[in-house]
Amino acid sequence: MKRQALFLSIFGVTMVTMPAFAADGASGITGVRWGKNAFNFEPMPSGPQPLRNLIRRPDGTGNAGQLVGDYHNPILKPEAAAVVKQKGELAAAGKGFPNAQDQCRAVAPPFTFAMQLSFQMLPKNNGDIAILYGQGDNVRHIRMNGTHPANLVPLPMGDSVGRWEGDALVIDTVGVRTDAFTSVDRFGIPQSDAMHVIERYRLIDGVLAKAAQDKYEKAEGIVGGGARFSGVNPDTGLKGLQLELTMEDPKVFTGPLTVLVTYRRLMTEWQEQVCADNPVEHYKDEWIGLPKADLADF
């Protein structure tokens, strides 16, 4: 089945034939806007675990508005644990610490998946995939069946190659350019130039997707207990999307860390979001000055 798209130009009207997207199966991952309400990562049933918030509400749930990461987690090397501890002390004292998103930097993997960012995958004419994120018009370009260049130049969103493994989309990313605001998650785990990220996306039953999101939101909480995507489609008859994310960074982690991130379909239309750069950070009625570069990084 094909669908027709109508394009207007100064030369007249052009009809372009585009492939239709199936509701399920491999192609059901693309052409859909996905979103989630909780921050950070869902744990795997076993193995190394992502950091947990040490600040708990009276009911035992995590307070996503005050981020004190478990720096004793054995997945962290001592240097990384010290950074998380320092940032946690700032948060516990009521002070914020900046990250790539609130500083209008590229929200690159794996931090992309620790945020509430919506996204949509769009197939390109040459078979590659573009991923649009709901933050500052961030875009990733996935070269399908490609390889990383031998002389890799670090890029704001890294270098990504992908492949289909049955009905799963697998994306391999290296070469993310780091700066003072780059981190793995919202607890401030540092990220080095050695970070290697493998994303494995697959469609899952809608009931399971809702259950996974509800369970994690209840356990770890969302900002203020209420900042949510109002456009999440409540129809559990629609497939959800589960990301199995593996992060390897020998300068930060003691071994590979694999986590889950569950997304559901959004009903709202794509909305452009413009990020305005700012030399200060506002956190709990306090303005915090931020470091400034002497020279441009381009």
Where are these regions (language model features)?
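Bacterial N-terminal signal peptides that target proteins for export
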Residues: M1-L8
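Position-driven detector of the extreme protein N-terminus
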Residues: K2, V16-P19, P45
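Bacterial N-terminal signal peptides
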Residues: L8-T17
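PEST-like low-complexity, intrinsically disordered acidic/proline/serine-rich tracts
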Residues: A22-F298
